[in-house]
Amino acid sequence: MTSKSLFFKLMKEDMKRRLWAVAFSLLTFFFAMPMAAAMGIASIGKEYENWLVNGTGYAEIGADALKHTKILRLVGEVLGFENAFLCVLVAAAAMILGLTGFLYLHSKKQVDFYNCLPVKREQLFAVKFLDGFLVLFAAYLINMIAAFAIFCGNGIQGGSIVKMMLSAFATHMVGFLLIYAVMVIAVLLTGNLFISILGAGVLYGYAPAISLLLSVLKEFFFVTTGRNSDMG
């Protein structure tokens, strides 16, 4: 019981030091989802007024049907996989949170301070790692729900978009954890900020480089590879 209470107390104290990350994450995801949804719907609303006066340009589609179709498309652009900015944002957040969460290891004073605490290193690592994930998880989830509410308030049935929205959310969280874990490993293996960034670049590029090397070697040394690709 004491160990559990200490763990959550450490999480709370660490989160206080990450308030800047919490605020920044909430703000950036607010612009990426709820704000994007509201601005997109406002733009469609102006088009809708024009369609009521001048027609939609489609004989078989009325203004209301076209408005609904465009809002549905907007849902995918904001909450789905089509939102490229959201993917970039998640990746950038993973790198920043992974880097800043464990930079204390590069400071002798901070390391001495944490070593003086009656806390196991494994527990301290778990606190830092989990807090970094929760910052992104909470910011994404809160703003996703806000954007979802905006769409539902504009005539979109929630059941029709929940599956797509949750699929994108789960995929982004898995991607975040992978990028985040690699950055944390880079920080643990190196000794300063600049080398950590370089190390992360090497780790991020390792798998693509191996994949590219294998494909090139196949083209050079395996004749059937080129033939199979041509036949396909």
Annotate each language-model stretch with its function.
Residues 47-82, 224-232:
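Long, glycine/tryptophan/cysteine-rich extracytoplasmic
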Residues 80-110:
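Long, hydrophobic alpha-helical segments
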Residues 6-11, 119-127, 190-199:
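Hydrophobic, small-residue-rich membrane helices and short re-entrant helix-turn-helix hairpins
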Residues 73-76, 80, 130-191, 195-196, ...:
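Secretory targeting signals
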Residues 17-58, 85-96, 200-210:
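Hydrophobic alpha-helical transmembrane segments of multi-pass membrane transport/permease proteins
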Residues 14, 104, 112-116, 184-189:
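Helix-loop junctions at the membrane interface of multi-pass solute transporters
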Residues 104-134:
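Helix-loop-helix units of permease transmembrane domains in multi-pass membrane transporters
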Residues 1-24:
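Aromatic- and glycine-rich beta-strand/loop motifs that create alpha-glucan
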